[in-house]
Design a protein with these regions (language model features):
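Family-specific signature for flavin-dependent thymidylate synthase
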Residues: 1-305
């Protein structure tokens, strides 16, 4: 989990003011140019008004491009189900670099000399060496978790023997991948053997409406799969840093429903007990009295705000 990094690459810098101005434009005779010069207090008020009226179309004018680096393909496949976004993902042909690093570390520990890059000594010979090093690492009792962790994601539920078994299976799969490359199978076909746990990176562009109405409510929730929940909470922290007047109100589905049916309060207020839930139950059917505990659980599993 600690190797998953979420960073904000680019965003609409004046997004808060732009959203407030767009919201006011729909109800004003003034020109958008004049509206944009509104004081900061008015920006805050118009943003709150979009929550009160569930008027989120102005939020589409502010756009955010961010990176999820080191997550698994299990996570990225869930991520791309969000249709109102643009994605660019590292090709699986280029995740081979992390597999090769695992093979080279194993080779170094075992005293096996493997070329650092396939082209240095003929690709097939290099692939044979990588495969041999990985297989020997599994047989010889080297720490498989240490070797596999840079290349693969381990679910936190795996501990003890289960963790070691998973690591050995990851390394064995990588060894077989290199065995296929060594006999001339293309990378496009050999990659069918690589587990979904392999790390990847993906660049995502979403507008603020997609973030507050769909991605963050669904993926910050306790019911979301642990890895994409971690990505969502990390992203929320980055968004609050740059546009607090927009994203301090955002959160899991319980918070979104509460904030669109009553006077909105910041997510931190719900976490710290300064605001209470009045909805009878959340969209996941958790009753009112259990919502805050569920929210704290989601936040705790994601590393706490």
């Amino acid at each position: 989990m600690d190797k998953i990094r979420v960073s904000l690459l680019a965003y609409t810098e004046d997004g808060e003011r732009l959203i407030a101005a767009a919201s006011k434009t729909s109800l004003s005779r003034k020109s958008p140019e004049k509206i944009l010069s509104m004081p900061d207090e008015e920006v805050e008020e118009w943003i709150r008004e979009t929550w009160r009226r569930q008027h989120f179309s102005p939020w589409e004018h502010s756009v955010y491009t961010w990176l999820a680096d080191g997550c698994s393909r299990v996570c990225s496949h869930q991520l791309v189900r969000h249709r109102l976004a643009s994605y660019t993902q590292q090709s699986m042909r280029y995740t081979e670099g992390s597999l090769r690093e695992a093979a080279l570390e194993a080779a170094g520990l075992l005293g096996i000399e493997c070329p650092r890059k396939p082209r240095e000594a003929g690709a097939r010979r290099a692939y044979e060496c990588y495969s041999m090093a990985l297989r020997e690492a599994v047989r010889s009792g080297l720490d498989p978790v240490r070797l596999a962790k840079p290349a693969f994601v381990f679910p936190p539920s795996l501990r003890g023997e289960a963790l070691v078994e998973a690591a050995n299976l990851y390394l064995e799969a990588a060894a077989r991948y290199y065995s296929l490359l060594a006999v001339g199978v293309s990378r496009e076909d050999a990659r069918f053997l690589i587990p979904h746990a392999v790390r990847t990176r993906i660049v995502v562009t979403m507008n603020a409406r997609e973030l507050v109405q769909s991605f963050l409510p669904l993926r910050m929730c306790t019911r979301a799969q642990w890895e994409i929940r971690l990505v969502a909470w990390k992203l929320w922290k980055r968004l609050v840093e740059v546009h607090p007047r927009l994203f301090k109100w955002a959160g899991p589905r319980c918070v979104f429903q509460q904030n669109t049916t009553s006077d909105p309060r910041p997510l931190v207020d719900y976490l710290e007990g300064r605001a209470s839930f009045t909805i009878p139950r959340c969209p996941e059917l958790v009753p009112r009295e259990g919502i805050r505990a569920c929210l704290l659980h989601a936040n705790g599993r994601a590393g706490r705000v």
